[in-house]
């Protein structure tokens, strides 16, 4: 079993897709908007509320890119492939409806000793105007595929500030949260099929990592941006543990002046870590 190292640097066109107002609303519901107070986030959960124009959660950027078109990553058991890190940069508020084009690039294979890290980058542009809407960087961890002699890659410094969080936001996920979130495009049966979840070592289907990421993005939007999507610039975090639907998520946010640091916990486990969030000046 080997990595397809020859694919390093490959670029591809992921295709064109259109999203609708309903798609943006469905995503918002999938990451908990309005669940605890149906009147609190109407700008994200409705399109026809009087004097409340529809807006789009910035983390919708993780699902709007095209599907497919990338190179084969290698000949290895996909059960050993894990979503390690995710970052997004949003260039202005996402529109409620749009037709977009997406491109991707395999940015690197990194040798982590016994394991490997694959990094892919993407960008999404408005198909009509060509305006850059969002950029993404996705890191995939492949267990047992290290030792190929490649670069290790740099690790950016990060530490928990030596003080209580400046903001603590708690969201309760629903028992059916994964069933809602999968309607935004990620139909991986690990999040819905009890048989497959058991085969992967879980008592029941787990929540999508990007759903946890979306809940965390909502917390950052409200705590650090005054609920204004135009102030949301970039978000980066590492996935460290799975979440079960129905668990509560605690988002710990520290204001460091030039950036916000964050981590998300579920009970006594850290599920998102090494988070860095940047805002735009108003």
Listing of model-derived features with the role each one plays in the protein:
Residues 1-8, 12, 64, 81-169, ...:
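HotDog/MaoC-like acyl-thioester-processing domains
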Residues 1-99:
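Hydrophobic, proline/glycine-rich low-complexity stretches
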Residues 2-45, 156-212, 219-222:
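A contiguous, surface-exposed recognition patch within enzymatic or periplasmic domains that forms
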Residues 20, 62-68, 139-145, 173-184:
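Phosphate-binding glycine-rich loops and adjacent basic patches that engage nucleotide phosphates
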Residues 26, 43, 58-59, 87, ...:
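Generic structural signal for residues positioned in beta-strands
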Residues 36-37, 126-131, 225-228:
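Short, glycine- and charge-enriched coil/turn segments that flank and shape catalytic ligand pockets
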Residues 42, 55-58, 79-80, 92, ...:
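Flexible, active-site-adjacent loop/turn segments at secondary-structure boundaries
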Residues 195-270:
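Catalytic-pocket segment enriched in acidic/His residues
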């Amino acid at each position: 079993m080997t990595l397809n190292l020859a694919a390093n640097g490959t670029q591809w066109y992921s295709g064109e897709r259109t999203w609708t107002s309903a798609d943006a609303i469905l995503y918002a519901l999938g990451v908990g908007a309005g669940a605890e107070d149906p009147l609190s986030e109407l700008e994200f959960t409705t399109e026809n509320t009087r004097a409340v124009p529809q807006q789009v959660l910035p983390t919708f950027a993780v699902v709007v890119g095209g599907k497919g078109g990338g190179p084969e990553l290698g000949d290895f058991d996909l059960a050993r492939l894990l979503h390690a890190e995710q970052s997004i940069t949003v260039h202005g508020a996402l529109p409620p409806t749009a037709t977009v084009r997406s491109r991707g690039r395999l940015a690197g294979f990194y040798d982590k000793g016994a394991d490997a890290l694959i990094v892919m980058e993407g960008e999404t542009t408005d198909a009509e105007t060509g305006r850059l809407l969002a950029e993404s960087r996705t890191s995939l961890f492949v267990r047992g595929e290290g030792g190929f002699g490649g670069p290790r890659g740099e690790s950016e410094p990060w530490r928990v500030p030596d003080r209580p969080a400046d903001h603590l936001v708690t969201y309760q996920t629903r028992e059916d949260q994964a069933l809602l979130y999968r309607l935004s495009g990620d139909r991986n049966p690990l999040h819905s099929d009890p048989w497959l979840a058991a085969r992967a070592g879980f008592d029941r289907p787990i929540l999508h990592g990007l759903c946890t990421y979306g809940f965390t993005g909502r917390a950052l939007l409200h705590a650090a941006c005054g609920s204004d999507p135009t102030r949301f610039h970039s978000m980066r975090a590492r996935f460290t543990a799975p979440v079960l639907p129905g668990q509560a998520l605690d988002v710990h946010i520290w204001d460091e002046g030039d950036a916000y640091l964050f981590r998300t916990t579920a009970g006594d486990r850290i599920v998102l870590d090494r988070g860095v969030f940047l805002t735009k000046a108003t």
